[in-house]
Amino acid sequence: MLKTNKKLAIAALAVTMAAPVNVLSQTRSEWNVPSAQYPMIDSERRATIKIDAPKASDVKAMVAGKTYPMTRDANGSWSVTTDPLVVGFHYYFLDIDSVRVTDPGTETFFGYSRLASGLEVPEGEEGDYYRPHRDVNHGQVRRVQYYSESSQAWREAVVYTPAEYDTNVKKRYPVLYLQHGMGEDGRGWTKQGRMQNIMDNMIASGKAVPMIVVMESGDINIPRKEGLSRNVEESPYGKSFYPVMLNDLIPMIDKTFRTKTDRESRAMAGLSWGGHQAADIVFPHLDKFAWLGLFSGAVYGLDVNKNYGGVLKDKDKVNTALKYFFIGCGTEESIGVPKLTKTLDEAGIRYDRFTSHGTGHEWLTWRRCLRAFITRVFQ
């Protein structure tokens, strides 16, 4: 019996040694250009980035806020595999001999006030709400150029219209004005955020009403100057957009599209500094807006007795005027939302709090916030 067991053990060892190595399955990032194999994403959500730079002496990859030194092979290709990443979209850059560049293997995105590379770590079925589906009617994303008297310049708005817009020609629609964050632009929500898929899917499921969504660059696509106040109404960053929004953008949208123009049919939401802008615009203009969404909203230093003309002192007025006030953020970010909600609680201002579990100050948080917000707005 001992000899038999020994033979079996040797045979098993031989089979094990002959078996192929179980390499983690890898897939190309969906944002790769057609000819690029890398970046690759493995089953542990790690990204492998590779670039040919035979004359470089030092190459690094900066992914999701972390810097990774890259290793050179004999052919002059540099590569690195990141730590496991949160599912969803991530900006990244390459640093080649101290020059920050984009990866030619991916499409480019406007983030950090410059062009950036991007990769998408696949989510499971729980991410189907931001994916396109063949059995769902799809709306359109339009780019609309208009002249702003306030800024004395030509500007561009990105506008989503629901699938039924061009066939239901007698119907008018409520409008959501949706702002991006600091260092991004009006394309962010449709590219990084995939808002058109979220809208299509939520409308098709009956969880959201058909609506028009308007996105504009908001004058926060340039870096914010250090040393200036971040507090509400004190910071000059992005303030130039406020008269554009109120005096030019809204009238242009109401003239160009079949909109409902009453305050109950107009909402504004934004992510990060776009949330700061949304609060700055909506609270002093409750005669024009009835819905407000702050997605990781950068609302700092709120003084309910002073800011927004003191409107927050009258809790009954605000709670009546705002049909829905949404505040959402991720569990892994420190944007100051707890301090904001504490201030609002003390003032008696009602709001609905949403938490994105396991996510930080990133696009997956804001995709989730948008999905949650639109299932309540205009309803």
Name the predicted role of every residue range.
Residues 27-29, 35, 41-67, 72-379:
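Non-catalytic cap/lid and distal C-terminal segments of serine-dependent acyl enzymes
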Residues 10-11, 32:
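General helical structural elements
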Residues 23-25:
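Boundary at the C-terminal end of the N-terminal hydrophobic targeting segment
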Residues 2-10:
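Bacterial N-terminal signal peptides that target proteins for export
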Residues 18-20:
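N-terminal signal peptide c-region/cleavage motif recognized by signal peptidases
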Residues 14-15:
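Short, linear, compositionally biased motifs with a strong N-terminal bias
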